Amino acid sequence: MGKLIVVGSCGVLVCVLASLYTIGNLLNEIEELQVEFQDGMVEFRAITQDTWARMVSKHINPTGHTNAPPTFETLFGARTARQAGFEQCNCGPKSEGCPAGPPGPPGEGGQKGNPGHDGDDGKPGAPGVIVAITHDIPGGCIKCPPGRPGPKGPSGLPGSAGPAGGNGRRGPPGPVGGPGEQGPQGDAGRPGAAGRPGPAGPRGEPGTEYKPGQPGRPGPQGPRGETGPAGNPGAPGNDGEAGKNGNAGRPGPPGHPGKNGVPGQKGEDAAPGPDAGYCPCPSRAAYKA
């Protein structure tokens, strides 16, 4: 989960940086276009003013430029055609305020004038601008060879995702992978059924025969055992020696006479016990006494 967050954050950061770079390039291009447009407007105004001045000069000086050399007609006036017959002096009063008459017939061809002086050098033209008005421009537009290609522009925005392509061909089978890591120990299975008894094994080698050794020393005395159950009442003991006469007691109340009991049977002799290693056993005569 943490890796996905880091990868997503890096992707968003890259997109933001790319957007800022693209916006900066667009603003730079817009500023360059604005400067070029202003320069083009200045050059266009200069061309229109120059063209307008030339058009006006054509109406004011129809013979040519204002600095053109004078001609025969401008110095001596146009020659009038001679009337047929005889010359007549026009001494009558001149008309005043009369409308102009119809144009006369074209006159005879004049003499060839002297070659004029070389004209002044023209003004330098606008650098590299397409002239929209070509009226009265000698030779028209100058066709210049194409210039060098400009610098490479910035990369465009990434296009939209194209349609999904078809399924490719099935590739060859990959190599066999190595053995994976050992998995965790599985749960214990159910105990299986008892198997058949196996065949009898081979006969073993004869064992080593040992002779009984000498009896060992008696061990130390063990701890005292727990108290055993109460034994059967023993045989009546021998009469003891007569004791000293006691003090006369207070006479007690007379008791009820008891019944005589039945004498018990004589018990069987017990089996002799094991000999102990720490003390000699007493003789049987002591018990019979």
Curated annotation (Swiss-Prot):
Keywords: Collagen, Cuticle, Disulfide bond, Repeat, Signal. GO terms for molecular function: structural constituent of collagen and cuticulin-based cuticle; structural constituent of cuticle. Residues 95-289 are annotated as: Disordered. The keyword Coiled coil does not apply. One of its GO terms (biological process) is collagen and cuticulin-based cuticle development. Pfam families: Col_cuticle_N, Collagen. Residues 101-130, 147-269 are annotated as: Triple-helical region. Residues 1-18 form the signal peptide. Residues 162-183 have a biased composition (Gly residues). One of its GO terms (cellular component) is collagen trimer. Residues 184-207, 223-239 have a biased composition (Low complexity). InterPro entries: Col_cuticle_N, Collagen. The keyword Signal applies. It comes from the Eukaryota. PANTHER family: COLLAGEN, CUTICLE COLLAGEN 19. Collagen polypeptide chains are complexed within the cuticle by disulfide bonds and other types of covalent cross-links. Belongs to the cuticular collagen family. Nematode cuticles are composed largely of collagen-like proteins. The cuticle functions both as an exoskeleton and as a barrier to protect the worm from its environment. This is Cuticle collagen 19. It comes from Caenorhabditis elegans. The lineage of its organism: Eukaryota, Metazoa, Ecdysozoa, Nematoda, Chromadorea.
